[in-house]
Amino acid sequence: MDSQRNLLVIALLFVSFMIWQAWEQDKNPQPQAQQTTQTTTTAAGSAADQGVPASGQGKLISVKTDVLDLTINTRGGDVEQALLPAYPKELNSTQPFQLLETSPQFIYQAQSGLTGRDGPDNPANGPRPLYNVEKDAYVLAEGQNELQVPMTYTDAAGNTFTKTFVLKRGDYAVNVNYNVQNAGEKPLEISTFGQLKQSITLPPHLDTGSSNFALHTFRGAAYSTPDEKYEKYKFDTIADNENLNISSKGGWVAMLQQYFATAWIPHNDGTNNFYTANLGNGIAAIGYKSQPVLVQPGQTGAMNSTLWVGPEIQDKMAAVAPHLDLTVDYGWLWFISQPLFKLLKWIHSFVGNWGFSIIIITFIVRGIMYPLTKTQYTSMAKMRMLQPKIQAMRERLGDDKQRISQEMMALYKAEKVNPLGGCFPLLIQMPIFLALYYMLMGSVELRQAPFALWIHDLSAQDPYYILPILMGVTMFFIQKMSPTTVTDPMQQKIMTFMPVIFTVFFLWFPSGLVLYYIVSNLVTIIQQQLIYRGLEKRGLHSREKKKS
């Protein structure tokens, strides 16, 4: 099997992968907002069951740290807006990226509170609590490492509920602490809940990548339990009222999108009910509700949870909750993508440029795979040397396919040639290529990361398509330099147009991935020449001899 036929095999595998990726995206299209007005069916016992209403009619307060800019509604204490000052909305933009939003076009909120029989967020006890705050704006001052935002509410029975947001410098994890003071004569039965709700359909101003099959990533809900470390839950599944309803001791619930996530992490010794819910009007929710605790008369009860609202930074997320870092979705090749990213990050700590880091890691990967590459070309050279014998065999045996197959296998065995030896190394390279693709699409560190010249964002496609064209040129040179025994006219035509086909495919791929492929091709050309010279010295003619 020669190099061009191997390239054809890899091309077919690659195209198959992209078709599968597009099919996964389109087979269950997201329901439109106007189509999701059916009656809401939710998990039994969930906060959504109890009808956590929209906040409304409260005062909006501002809470700012060096990395978070939150807007909290005093009606219920929900986070209705979250801006991330360290992450621009767009390249060269002065506007921060907005993760949580409350507008007529789009809803994405982090709700939380106290429910249960005596909880102030239980609709049976009246409207959601209207908390009192000392001021309208809280700002983390210079030299200050922690910012506390206390909110208090006293019900008609004189019971006092305090909800305190605790934010730390440089941290995207927000602790939410509750204190319940029982002023009555009967125990209070209280449960905590945390809920994330979001519009299923993105408005046009936020839908910037779903039309590009090469840049499509998962957007939806997810959860983790001790038994299931990481499970995704699609919005369209929630819209169909096929809802989650499980009990878990520990774990978390989350909503994910490319590079960013929100998550509620409950902190208690009991079990929690994890649920999803179709809230109607095109809004999906995922949340948790804790087991009720009793606060005795004259006593104070303390409960707490953590809200992650920010970028998917793996090491920081892992420190907040077990397996929260798995929300950095590297797909089914995570076991390759994760070590690749760790190596890339380590290289970046020295060179300071993600583009040059990709170039270096390409040399490392190709160096590690050099023995396989050498085996590939050696096997191809041996196969080429056998072609005259195989051709004579075909002429001698005619149409007796069984005899031809038997004698060919005997010939391969006698000459110690593996007919698949040229294909196997290429098959090994395919998972690495796909793992790098997942890594580039899932690592927030590479978002808006510049390289050089006109490449200002390695996670986005080349705006001028120069890199894909260069990639096609390198493929063309590899094809011309490689030996071929392809005689089938159709295969010859396919191979002729393969660089063009790949160039068109790569027009929409992240620049970092195209850069990897260009450097990989250049290294292949160098390795190819070195291996060919060694084979010629051994009498293995890997290429056509020039006619004198």
Curated annotation (Swiss-Prot):
Residue spans crossing the bilayer: 6-26, 350-370, 420-440, 458-478, 499-519
Predominant location: membrane
GO biological process, one term: protein transport
Subcellular location: Cell inner membrane
Ranges of compositional bias, category Low complexity: 30-50
Topological category with respect to the lipid bilayer: Multi-pass membrane protein
Region (Disordered): 28-55
GO cellular component term, pick one: plasma membrane
UniProt keyword annotations, A-Z: Cell inner membrane, Cell membrane, Chaperone, Membrane, Protein transport, Transmembrane, Transmembrane helix, Transport
Pfam short name (any one): YidC_periplas
GO molecular function: membrane insertase activity
InterPro entries for the chain: Membr_insert_YidC, Membr_insert_YidC_N, YidC/ALB3/OXA1/COX18, YidC/Oxa/ALB_C, YidC_ALB_C, YidC_periplasmic_sf
Complex and partners: Interacts with the Sec translocase complex via SecD. Specifically interacts with transmembrane segments of nascent integral membrane proteins during membrane integration.
The family this protein is said to belong to: Belongs to the OXA1/ALB3/YidC family. Type 1 subfamily.
HAMAP family: YidC_type1
Task performed by this protein: Required for the insertion and/or proper folding and/or complex formation of integral membrane proteins into the membrane. Involved in integration of membrane proteins that insert both dependently and independently of the Sec translocase complex, as well as at least some lipoproteins. Aids folding of multispanning membrane proteins.
NCBIfam families cross-referenced by the UniProt entry: PRK01318.1-1, PRK01318.1-3, PRK01318.1-4, yidC_nterm, yidC_oxa1_cterm
Name of this chain's protein: Membrane protein insertase YidC
Organism: Shigella boydii serotype 18 (strain CDC 3083-94 / BS512)
Gene assigned in the entry: yidC
